[in-house]
Amino acid sequence: MLPKVETEALGLARSNGEQGQMPENMQVSQFKMVNYSYDEDLEELCPVCGDKVSGYHYGLLTCESCKGFFKRTVQNNKRYTCIENQNCQIDKTQRKRCPYCRFQKCLSVGMKLEAVRADRMRGGRNKFGPMYKRDRALKQQKKALIRANGLKLEAMTQVIQAMPTDLTISSAIQNIHSASKGLPLNHTALPPTDYDRSPFVTSPISMTMPPHGSLQGYQTYGHFPSRAIKSEYPDPYTSSPESIMGYSYMDGYQTSSPASIPHLILELQKCEPDEPQVQAKIMAYLQQEQANRSKHEKLNTFGLMCKMADQTLFSIVEWARSSIFFRELKVDDQMKLLQNCWSELLILDHIYRQVVHVKEGSILLVTGQQVDYSVIASQAGATLNNLMSHAQELVAKLRSLQFDLREFVCLKFLVLFSLDVKNLENFQLVEGVQEQVNAALLDYTMCNYPQQTDKFGQLLLRLPEIRAISMQAEEYLYCKHLNGDVPCNNLLIEMLHAKRA
């Protein structure tokens, strides 16, 4: 039985976070202030019919009407038919005209069948409780800020200048503190971020995915007669990459055309989060968190890093929950997979960021800021220095392999859909994803890196190394937690406790 706190934590892709501070020499976003009405864009609308939401029902924010409709349909085991073409428009004025299309839309936007009680008693199967509380708190915080200030900050588009590189962690902490006082921040322009997007809303990609049983619709890579699988999708990664905020997950090595990229890999790539937006969310969270702290409550270096890791973990959970194939799994299977690999995904994310970071002797933070490796090493103990050393060795190996974005995406899915996880209800899907991604990765490496005849095998050999580093990192973090050095009430700690339950 999973501990309650952990079960709820994984029902969530939280964008609300906890605090820290950022390097000093950051290019400041220029903001313009405009009149802002609270109702303008904070008022939530039901994703099914567009009516005003009444609260969280069966997995996401919906209106009272769609909540009742969904509950009655599931509890009464109703079966509907559509007299048209099963694509009826569902909105507030005609949501009752076609119950079949309405129910299908409920499912497509993310309402959870398993959250409805079969015994007709009041109260759902609430695996998402703390998510609701956190999300409500975030919305209330936004409302309070807007009402207090009466303005809306809009990041103005501007030419992005190169980030300074001589940054230290201490200056990072000072920078957030300055932001809370209204002092200039050397921070690049942040794109508007969608903090209130529900993690349960179905993405356009996942709605077009085939049934998961056979993974039909994707190229089967049992044989490789042509080594060139054409795709109708444009490939945004073949153009020359440009860093938006100090870094982006660009493709630093290969320049292959979409014709030489397996269709499955292109689909996996589409699931990747927008890195500048992730950076903006984490930065905004750290700034807000620091602004809420008194002078004597500022985070130390380690606390800051924990906050960054916690927010990165939330973005990883959100990525997983919105990804193809993973969405097809029931919540229990999703939780088991994420429980198993969360630290590996964190390490892999950090490793790839360093691979594409070109400056030697510095570490690229998830916020896009660079910190001298020597600065971190001087403040870290023997255990953390050992972990950092192993991570840098792995970075060097992957750089020598010319590790690129598409291979990174494949490894993320191989880590997520691990065959080591026991008692999965839909093990067949997990096994199928493993086989298909492995085959696509093999095809891709052979086609695009023919001079590296064993690149596929070398990439797979890095996975045990990532796991070893992640296990050491977990042990280190847990010991620090027991000593009271890790900020409490965050997803990192919830996951650590869950894994030891």
Swiss-Prot record:
Keywords: Activator, Chromosome, DNA-binding, Metal-binding, Nucleus, Receptor, Transcription, Transcription regulation, Zinc, Zinc-finger. One of its GO terms (molecular function) is RNA polymerase II cis-regulatory region sequence-specific DNA binding. A motif (FTZ-F1 box) lies at residues 128-147. The keyword Transcription applies. Monomer; Binds DNA as a monomer. Detected in liver and adrenal gland. A zinc finger (NR C4-type) spans 46-66, 82-106. Gene3D superfamilies: Erythroid Transcription Factor GATA-1, subunit A, Retinoid X Receptor. Residues 260-499 form the NR LBD domain. The gene is NR5A2. The C-terminal extension (CTE) loop competes with a DNA minor groove anchor of the nucleosome and releases entry-exit site DNA, thereby promoting opening of closed chromatin. Belongs to the nuclear hormone receptor family. NR5 subfamily. Residues 186-207 are annotated as: Disordered. Zn(2+) 1 binds at residues 46, 49, 63, 66. Residues 43-114 bind DNA. GO terms for biological process: hormone-mediated signaling pathway; positive regulation of DNA-templated transcription; regulation of transcription by RNA polymerase II; somatic stem cell population maintenance; tissue development. It is found in: Nucleus; Chromosome. One of its GO terms (cellular component) is RNA polymerase II transcription regulator complex. Residues 488-499 are annotated as: AF-2. Zn(2+) 2 binds at residues 82, 88, 98, 101. Its main location: nucleus. Residues 112-127 are annotated as: C-terminal extension (CTE). Orphan nuclear receptor that binds DNA as a monomer to the 5'-TCAAGGCCA-3' sequence and controls expression of target genes: regulates key biological processes, such as cholesterol and bile acid synthesis pathways, as well as cartilage, liver and pancreas morphogenesis. Ligand-binding causes conformational change which causes recruitment of coactivators, promoting target gene activation. The specific ligand is unknown, but specific phospholipids, such as phosphatidylethanolamine, phosphatidylserine, dilauroyl phosphatidylcholine and diundecanoyl phosphatidylcholine can act as ligand in vitro. This is Nuclear receptor subfamily 5 group A member 2. A phospholipid derivative binds at residues 381-384, 476, 480. Pfam families: Hormone_recep, zf-C4.
